[in-house]
From Swiss-Prot:
Domain Glutamine amidotransferase type-1: 1-185
Residues reported in the UniProt entry to bind ATP: S213, G214, G215, V216, D217, S218, S219
Class of this enzyme: ligase
Signal peptide bounds: none
UniProt name for this protein: GMP synthase [glutamine-hydrolyzing]
NCBIfam families in the cross-refs: guaA_Cterm (TIGR00884), guaA_Nterm (TIGR00888), PRK00074.1 (NF000848)
Quaternary structure and interacting proteins, as annotated: Homodimer.
Protein function: Catalyzes the synthesis of GMP from XMP.
Biological pathway: Purine metabolism; GMP biosynthesis; GMP from XMP (L-Gln route): step 1/1
C-alpha cells in the first residue's frame, strides 16, 4: 500500500487518485494518525499551506522514524524532509502556477523531456540540501525544484499530481514502478469479490436497511450488499416530491424488476411540501429536508427488524469529514443520514468508503448496473428544492421538472450528456416580459447550468455548442408553460458554487 500523508494540501486526494489510476492501492492519513507499518510499501508526503518554520507547523509522523522504505515528498513535504535532515529552507520570492523546470537524468524522470512545465505553489524554498542529496531539477528562476539521495528519498518542489504539470502522471508511475518496484494490485473484480465476502461476514443472516436515492453511490452500495445478503437488505426510496421527471419510476424499474430487490417506496410528497411552505432561505430548506428525511426513514425502519444501516459513503466524503475539523470551512450543509446510526442504534456498514467516485462507477459496471444509472450526473440530496430559488411550490417544481428534462434530453440527443460532469436547470424567482403570438407574456426565467469537473471541488463552465443550447432554449420556451426566457450560466467554481443554492 502507498500511504499519502496529508499536510493540508488541496491536492492530497489527487495524489491518491493518480496512484490508484496506476492500479496500486493507496490511502490518505493525517500526520497524527496511527499507522500499521506492516501494510505500508511506500510513503508520500503531501504539500500544505504552512511554513516548516512556524512554531505549530505539522511535523513528520511519530511512526516515520520506524519506517525505512522509499519516500516521495512533495512541496511542503520536501521542505519538511530537508529541514529534518539538516538542510536549509527559507522564505523566498515564491513560485506560483505554471513554471519551466530543467530535469537531470533520474529514474523518476525516465521518458520525460529535459525541459517541462510544472505546477508550483510555494513561498518557502530550499537553499541548501541535506548531506548526501543532489538536485535533479532546477526551475527557471534557479530554485531547486527536485532532489534525491539516490537511495530512499525523492523530493519534488512542484505538484506532479495536477494535470497542469506536464508528464506528472509519468513521474508518479516512474516512482511507483521504477523506484519502488511495486506491482499492480488494484483490480476491480478482485476488490468486488473481497467486499462481498466482507459484507457476508459482517452482516451474516441479519437484516440491513439502506436509503436508496437512485444516485450512483447509493445504487452501487445497494447492489453490492444485495449481492452479499439478498432479500435481507431492505432498500427504502423516499419520494419527497423533489425528484426529477420519471425518477421514481426508473428506480422502481431498475432495482425492483431488474435486480429483484426488496424495495420499499415511501410517498412523502405532501409532508415535505407542507414543511417547505413559505421557506425561502436555502440553508433552512436543506435543514428541513434533511430532518424530515430522517423522520420518514426512521418510521419505515421501525417496521423492519434490522440491525445494520448501509450508507453509500465514498472515500472523498471520508477525507473531507476527517479534514473538516482541521482546515476547512462549511460552505453548505450536506443532506445525508449521518446521524441515523446513533439515533437508531444501528451498526453502520459503508462498503464504498475506500473508493473514489470513478472507482465506484467501475464497481457499478462490474455489477451490471445500467449505464444510465452509473453515468448519472450528481444530484443534490434536497433535490429540486435547491434548484427552485425561493419558495418551493408544486407549480414551480413541475415547471422546473419539465425544463430540466428537456435540457438533459437535448444533451443526450446530441451525445453531449457524457461530455459534461453535471448539467441541470434552475428556476429563478423572477419573471420577465416577452411576446408569445401577438400577446404580451410575463413568465418565469430558467437558467441552464453545465460544468466540467473531476471531483466537484473546482469546476469550469461547459462550452456547450450554441446550436445545442439554442435547441434546448427553444423547446423549453415553447413546451413548458410558464417559462418565457432561458439564460446560460457561465460562472466557474470558484467564485460560484456548482448549485445555485
Amino acid at each position: 500500500m502507498v500511504l499519502v500523508v496529508d499536510y493540508g494540501s488541496q491536492y492530497s486526494r489527487l495524489i491518491t487518485r493518480r496512484i490508484r489510476e496506476n492500479e496500486v492501492y493507496s490511502e490518505v492519513v493525517f500526520p497524527d494518525d496511527k499507522v500499521d507499518l506492516s501494510k505500508v510499501d511506500t510513503v508520500i508526503l503531501s504539500g500544505g499551506p504552512r511554513s516548516v518554520y512556524e512554531e505549530d507547523a505539522p511535523k513528520l509522523p511519530e511512526w516515520f522514524q520506524e519506517y525505512k522504505g522509499p519516500v516521495l515528498a512533495i512541496c511542503y513535504g520536501m521542505q519538511l524532509i530537508v529541514k529534518e535532515l539538516g538542510g536549509e529552507v527559507r522564505r523566498g520570492r515564491g513560485e506560483y502556477g505554471r513554471t519551466l523546470v530543467e530535469l537531470s537524468r533520474d529514474p523518476i524522470f525516465e521518458g520525460i523531456p529535459e525541459k517541462v512545465h510544472v505546477w508550483m505553489s510555494h513561498g518557502d524554498e530550499v537553499v541548501r540540501l541535506p548531506e548526501g542529496f543532489h538536485p535533479i531539477a532546477v526551475s527557471e528562476t534557479g530554485v531547486i525544484a527536485a532532489a534525491t539521495d539516490g537511495k530512499r528519498f525523492w523530493l519534488l518542489q512542484f505538484h506532479p499530481e495536477v494535470h497542469h504539470t506536464e508528464y506528472g502522471d509519468r513521474m508518479i508511475s516512474n516512482f511507483l514502478f521504477n523506484v519502488c518496484k511495486l506491482e499492480k494490485n488494484w483490480k476491480i473484480g478482485d476488490l468486488v469479490e473481497e467486499k462481498i465476502r466482507h459484507i457476508k461476514e459482517t452482516i451474516g443472516n441479519k437484516k440491513a436497511i439502506l436509503a436508496l436515492s437512485g444516485g450512483v453511490d447509493s445504487s452501487v452500495a445497494a447492489v453490492l450488499v444485495h449481492r452479499a445478503i439478498g432479500k435481507n437488505l431492505v432498500c427504502v426510496f423516499v419520494d419527497h416530491g423533489l425528484l426529477r421527471k420519471n425518477e421514481r419510476e426508473e428506480v422502481e424499474r431498475v432495482f425492483k424488476e431488474h435486480f429483484d430487490m426488496n424495495l420499499v417506496v415511501v410517498d412523502a410528497r405532501k409532508r415535505f411540501l407542507e414543511k417547505l411552505r413559505g421557506v425561502t432561505d436555502p440553508e433552512k430548506k436543506r435543514k428541513i429536508i434533511g430532518e424530515e428525511f430522517i423522520r420518514v426513514f426512521e418510521e419505515e425502519a421501525k417496521k423492519h427488524d434490522v440491525e445494520f444501516l448501509v450508507q453509500g459513503t465514498i472515500y472523498s466524503d471520508v477525507i473531507e469529514s476527517a479534514a473538516s475539523g482541521k482546515t476547512t470551512a462549511k460552505i453548505k450543509s450536506h443532506h445525508n443520514v449521518g446521524g441515523l446510526p446513533e439515533k437508531m442504534n444501528l451498526k453502520l456498514v459503508e462498503p464504498l468508503r475506500d473508493l473514489f467516485k470513478d472507482e465506484v462507477r467501475k464497481v457499478g459496471k462490474y455489477l451490471g448496473i445500467p449505464d444510465r444509472i452509473i453515468n448519472r450526473h450528481p444530484f443534490p440530496g434536497p433535490g429540486l428544492a435547491v434548484r427552485v430559488l425561493g419558495e418551493v411550490t408544486e407549480e414551480k417544481l413541475e415547471i422546473l421538472r419539465e425544463a430540466d428534462y428537456i435540457f438533459i434530453e437535448t444533451l443526450r440527443k446530441h451525445d453531449y450528456y457524457d461530455k459534461v460532469w453535471q448539467a441541470f436547470a434552475v428556476l429563478l424567482p423572477i419573471k420577465s416580459v416577452g411576446v408569445k403570438g401577438d400577446a404580451r407574456a410575463y413568465e418565469y426565467v430558467v437558467a441552464l447550468r453545465a460544468v466540467n469537473s473531476v471531483e466537484g471541488m473546482t469546476a469550469d463552465w461547459s462550452r456547450i455548442p450554441h446550436d445545442i443550447l439554442d435547441e434546448a432554449a427553444r423547446r423549453i420556451t415553447r413546451e413548458v408553460k410558464g417559462v418565457g426566457r432561458v439564460v446560460y450560466d457561465i460562472t466557474s467554481k470558484p467564485p460560484a458554487t456548482i448549485e445555485w443554492e
